[in-house]
């Protein structure tokens, strides 16, 4: 097969699979939470109002448009792999057994650090205008479809993290797959509009640095705070945490019968 045909085939597969993953995971979450168990889960809804069809159409449109970035970076990563530039390894015992598992939280921390600082800049000029970050903030009452619903200019910046990590950090395909599943799932949960996390989540020593759906909802409501994605570590460190976050969260989580241990 000629090289150009190979890359054309790969590009088509990347765009198709990225689009299907987005539609299946977001639609699946929406179908279960917003439809199938709508009445049972209504007490966990952050904003009692339902997302409008217009808002969800807006999110899906930009969510699919952003897949052009997955196509571009997917082709770049394929080219890097084809030319031996990726740090992938395929034998699990090439590194200590614990490395393949420990690197996952390390990657999550690094990814969140990159996201926090790039996201913070997107709320400042000229980066806000250049990345068209206003597209993502076109909806306040978010839904699962908000995940990855950004202008391609913003998506280009957000996804730049991936090829850099794949070149610099040795990763096994299993580790990489788990990392991608976790990040996508957390993105959907964070934009879901429902708060299922237990009471005490924002103050427990085990989870206080984690993000939540309430955390990100407040960012959409007030764009000057809560810039983290998976974590709120940098927001706590840099003083950009919404001062009402913990109280807001507990008010939404009061219906959850589970409570995490918290400091006295």
Per-range role (PLM):
Residues 12-16, 64, 101, 105-106, ...:
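Hydrophobic alpha-helical transmembrane segments of multi-pass membrane proteins
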Residues 25, 29-33, 73-74, 115, ...:
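Alpha-helical transmembrane segments and their lipid-water interface positions
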Residues 72-110:
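Juxtamembrane helix-loop-helix connectors linking adjacent transmembrane helices
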